[in-house]
Amino acid sequence: MVEIYYDDDASLDVLADRKVAVIGYGSQGHAHALNLRDSGVDVRVGLPADSRSRARAEEEGLRVLTPAEASAEADIIMLLTPDTTHRTIYAESIAPHLTAGKALAFGHGFNIRYGLIEPPAGVDVFMVAPKGPGHLVRRVFEEGKGVPVLVAVEADASGNALAVALAYAKGIGGTRAGALRTTFTEETETDLFGEQAVLCGGASALVQAGFETLVEAGYTPEVAYFECLHELKLIVDLMYEGGISQMRYSISDTAEYGDVTRGPRVITPAVKAEMRKILDEIRDGAFAREWVAEDDNGRPNFTKLVAEGKQHPIEQVGAKLRPMMSWIA
């Protein structure tokens, strides 16, 4: 069973004499910085001089420096920019100031898991990864609650890395809900698999295939859109709130019977075998190597595939129908 830590298991006193730098001010960066600040932590934000986020961070009362300046000052450096920017930011702005006794932290394990960043000996390396978007992390913190987080320690040079990670998690509100102990490897591999096989890749491909099947059979594209894309949120919300069984309890008997008898015909053993291949590519590093090479080469295939996706008929149909929906238009 997973170890779960709560407020009583963490102490902000661990951070009392430490300076924290949050590098980045996007979805997670702004939530981490503001929550830490409101928890009494000495925090500064690291942003390039030309970053459009500097004004926003300053308006919200935060001290803003360049990533290099923030890293030089800080005892704990949390890197919360997109994965593909980490290597450059680390090499240019963090590594020169990452001396023994400091800690390097992440919100996702990708660059450590695949060896793209190799911190020096004498440095703690940990992860605090909220299981929710930054705006939710900030909002529930202000409500006196928290979003669950994953906590991992990759390097414990000080012998106190877990306590520091838990203190950080408490500072952003994570231990109010619960901090689940994991590893960089587990977090990275499961996160990538979920994105590729289920949440993003799997879901979008399933929706498009269902839409295409109905339209090719002669059904109206607008009705196909409602049945295969629009109503997906209704079902996902039920699953989100109470699990698959609660969703099945909430739908009609006809829908439930179709679920349990036809669903396995869609997700067949062959589909699961392909899922295992995707997982193998994640575990052996093939996906990471492919993505890093694609990014380093200017993203030609990525750009092409995204552009092609935008031309799918379901996008045009959705653009026509969504203005009818006052709650989202």
Curated annotation (Swiss-Prot):
* Co-factor(s): Mg(2+)
Cite a GO CC annotation.
cytosol
Quick check: keyword NADP in the entry?
yes
The chemistry this enzyme catalyses reads: (2R)-2,3-dihydroxy-3-methylbutanoate + NADP(+) = (2S)-2-acetolactate + NADPH + H(+); (2R,3R)-2,3-dihydroxy-3-methylpentanoate + NADP(+) = (S)-2-ethyl-2-hydroxy-3-oxobutanoate + NADPH + H(+)
Instruction: Please give the biological process terms from Gene Ontology that the record holds.
Output: isoleucine biosynthetic process; L-valine biosynthetic process
Q: Where, by residue number, is the active site? A: H108
Q: Give UniProt keywords alphabetically.
A: Amino-acid biosynthesis, Branched-chain amino acid biosynthesis, Magnesium, Metal-binding, NADP, Oxidoreductase
Q: Where does Mg(2+) 1 bind?
A: D191, E195
Tell me the ranges covered by the KARI N-terminal Rossmann domain, including all copies: 2-182
Q: Which residues are Mg(2+) 2-binding?
A: D191, E227, E231
Q: Outline what the protein does.
A: Involved in the biosynthesis of branched-chain amino acids (BCAA). Catalyzes an alkyl-migration followed by a ketol-acid reduction of (S)-2-acetolactate (S2AL) to yield (R)-2,3-dihydroxy-isovalerate. In the isomerase reaction, S2AL is rearranged via a Mg-dependent methyl migration to produce 3-hydroxy-3-methyl-2-ketobutyrate (HMKB). In the reductase reaction, this 2-ketoacid undergoes a metal-dependent reduction by NADPH to yield (R)-2,3-dihydroxy-isovalerate.
Q: What is this protein called?
A: Ketol-acid reductoisomerase (NADP(+))
**Organism whose genome encodes this protein:** Frankia casuarinae (strain DSM 45818 / CECT 9043 / HFP020203 / CcI3)
